[in-house]
Amino acid sequence: MRPLLLLAPLGWLLLAEAKGDAKPEDNLLVLTVATKETEGFRRFKRSAQFFNYKIQALGLGEDWNVEKGTSAGGGQKVRLLKKALEKHADKEDLVILFTDSYDVLFASGPRELLKKFRQARSQVVFSAEELIYPDRRLETKYPVVSDGKRFLGSGGFIGYAPNLSKLVAEWEGQDSDSDQLFYTRIFLDPEKREQINITLDHRCRIFQNLDGALDEVVLKFEMGHVRARNLAYDTLPVLIHGNGPTKLQLNYLGNYIPRFWTFETGCTVCDEGLRSLKGIGDEALPTVLVGVFIEQPTPFVSLFFQRLLRLHYPQKHMRLFIHNHEQHHKAQVEEFLAEHGSEYQSVKLVGPEVRMANADARNMGADLCRQDRSCTYYFSVDADVALTEPSSLRLLIQQNKNVIAPLMTRHGRLWSNFWGALSADGYYARSEDYVDIVQGRRVGVWNVPYISNIYLIKGSALRGELQSPDLFHHSKLDPDMAFCANVRQQDVFMFLTNRHTLGHLLSLDSYRTTHLHNDLWEVFSNPEDWKEKYIHQNYTKALAGKLVETPCPDVYWFPIFTEVACDELVEEMEHFGQWSLGDNKDNRIQGGYENVPTIDIHMNQIGFEREWHKFLLEYIAPMTEKLYPGYYTRAQFDLAFVVRYKPDEQPSLMPHHDASTFTINIALNRVGVDYEGGGCRFLRYNCSIRAPRKGWTLMHPGRLTHYHEGLPTTRGTRYIAVSFVDP
């Protein structure tokens, strides 16, 4: 009898091979249920097309007859499958894969699928799960499994058409009944299980259900390929199912599988389905509603509006909605609208006097676009976003996603405007790829669970899946998290792109509103924005040696400050108002005696000493080392101050040596406009600089060689900023 026992399985294998002689695409049909084309369904189709699967979607256009979020349901899938199988019931060679679609993707092709199906040595193979559902009382009836997952999962199964017809033949339930329970009861009936020849994919060789198995599944990269690997069983599943609460993990895996992103190829799908704006005239561009949100005291608001104006997009196709919650920024907003509001198609301002809550304002902005069918896009931008790339809006539109955000990070930090994963309670969790995405080691368009600060939404999405007028409320969540939770709940994907550097996030942690011009104090927290606002645009040319003049021996003259920097420093000093008396007695300095007194205010009097030292280190020290080769400075100073010269107050300054190794002297206003006269004369060289340029600095040696005097100011008021460096 032993030879006969050996021949039986061999005969079955020969039969199975005979059934599989045709090409995989000829004897395999994939059936799925999709009542509407969601983004999840389109992802499923894309992964299927990648491997050339034949797909037939059942139920498109039907209502889904189960309330969303309820645990029961799925009977509608059985009804649709039963009807679809009627024309295939006698096709013995036809293998049918039935699977969910919204939360499923393929990781491999038909040939591997059929090979693993045959190796299972059953006519029907169901996916297996770690958790029993929906009736835990049935646990004891399940066959014991020594290695692998024990419980049936109805989200995916494969079998020969006649066997599947037998499987669903007894279905007479309602659409709202549980398909999982229906299939479970058949499987747990030993007679039916044997008759239909059903087994489970215990070791996840074909199907990987993620619920209860998140720790088992990792990405496996290998020479331009990427798969999901089950660590527990060392298998490479063909289908990945984000069942239950694991859809976000499927989104993460779907950023890579199947071969959408690898280390060798980078992103292979980022240029699919783009909306090209090339060759489209301004008059044909889509209308964009820009929502601007100033929800807390924020540095560089004036710079924010300048960047908005620099966008390469016609204002006549842009509408503005501005919510300013802060009285502190009221003047800046009103100044911008007074100068540029008429350039936009329309403007709506909700100011601090209205006292509108953050979430309500954001709902209002989105609804303005939703209610206007001519609004093609809604572009939401918070004031703490530094949008430095003028092509930002066009680049986001071209990516052609329902919801997309550009990557924004804080300077020198991993803090960004997206999360790669969520914790069990719905808050931040770091995904495996988060750091690589933030630091640009992985570049692409990523499906993520959370975005904030800046994003573009299609108007059609706001009038469709996101039509709820209350997107920014959800339980007790903050508006940003509420928005993302509501978007996820509607099965709309949120994408993040780091294909281009469009800007960065400001740091608000140390921003103070106690000064007249608070941005001056942001050199540490937001150095790039501080540089853009306050450092002369030609400073880099000077650093390259292309814009440095030598009006007198060893005296160098180059641009350093913008007009705004000069004006704000002067205004800050006048606002402080505690000018010295210009006599020798001076309690502000060590010893209390000033040999060469001026009417001035020291940087430390306005709490600006630390920031001034940072400025010297970052911008003056590099020039010093270039202009005085061999000399290296740490930019130490005892005295840094702004001097005021007036004809009736202190018009000039007596000849003197500075108590420094070198001195910088920055002109803060304009000769011939703000004052007449003034300048500096170096006596030893009989050399004078009589027309200082606003924003330019003189740099010269201090003690010993460069004996100099301040020439008389004959009209108006002259201001200079002086530092005695390395005393």
Curated annotation (Swiss-Prot):
Q: Membrane topology per the record?
A: Peripheral membrane protein
**Enzyme class per UniProt:** oxidoreductase
> Which residues hold Fe cation?
656, 658, 708
Cystine pairs annotated here are: none
Q: Which residues form the signal peptide?
A: 1-18
The Enzyme Commission number assigned here is 1.14.11.4
| Gene Ontology biological process | peptidyl-lysine hydroxylation
Reported cofactor(s): Fe(2+); L-ascorbate
Give the location in the cell: Rough endoplasmic reticulum membrane
Major site of localization recorded for this protein: endoplasmic reticulum
What interactions and quaternary structure are annotated?
Homodimer. Identified in a complex with P3H3 and P3H4.
Record-given protein name: Procollagen-lysine,2-oxoglutarate 5-dioxygenase 1
Give the organism the record lists. Answer: Pongo abelii (Sumatran orangutan)
Identify the coding gene. PLOD1
